[in-house]
């Protein structure tokens, strides 16, 4: 069970961990170190960060976290489409609009790595370049990117 990311020409498969890593990589491309740091905190916060920061419950921590993210995004005029992509639930997200794909493309177009985000051992294991190709095609052809 995992996620298939597709458009009208191509699809890639990855597990939830691969999708988490993909979005974590994309978050490092956002031109605001404060955002990069708080996004990284998300993974830590889910398990222990709330205790370290003196919150009594995870709910209190995440309410504070959401407020800090919103304040950082507004103050730094971060791209709402990209931020929404990074924070969307991977369980309920079904598509990304062509507009959001264009915004995402401008952020990721000059980046590449050799990390395997898909299922290792498969001949078609998804890499960042495969994700970029899907995003670029959606942006160029004005098509929706789908998640299933």
Predicted regions mapped to residue ranges:
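Acidic (Asp/Glu-rich) sequence patches and key acidic residues
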Residues: 1-148
């Amino acid at each position: 069970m995992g996620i298939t990311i597709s458009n009208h020409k191509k699809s890639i498969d990855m597990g939830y961990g691969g999708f988490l890593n993909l979005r974590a990589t994309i978050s490092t491309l956002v031109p605001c170190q404060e955002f990069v740091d708080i996004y990284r905190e998300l993974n830590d916060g889910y398990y222990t960060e709330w205790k370290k920061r003196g919150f009594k419950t995870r709910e209190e921590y995440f309410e504070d976290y959401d407020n800090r993210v919103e304040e950082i995004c507004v103050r730094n005029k971060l791209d709402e489409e990209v931020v929404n992509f990074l924070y969307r639930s991977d369980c309920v997200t079904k598509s990304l609009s062509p507009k959001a794909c264009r915004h995402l493309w401008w952020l990721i177009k000059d980046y590449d790595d050799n990390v395997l985000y898909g299922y290792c051992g498969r001949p078609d294991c998804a890499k960042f370049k495969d994700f970029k190709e899907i995003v670029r095609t959606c942006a160029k052809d004005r098509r929706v990117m789908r998640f299933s």
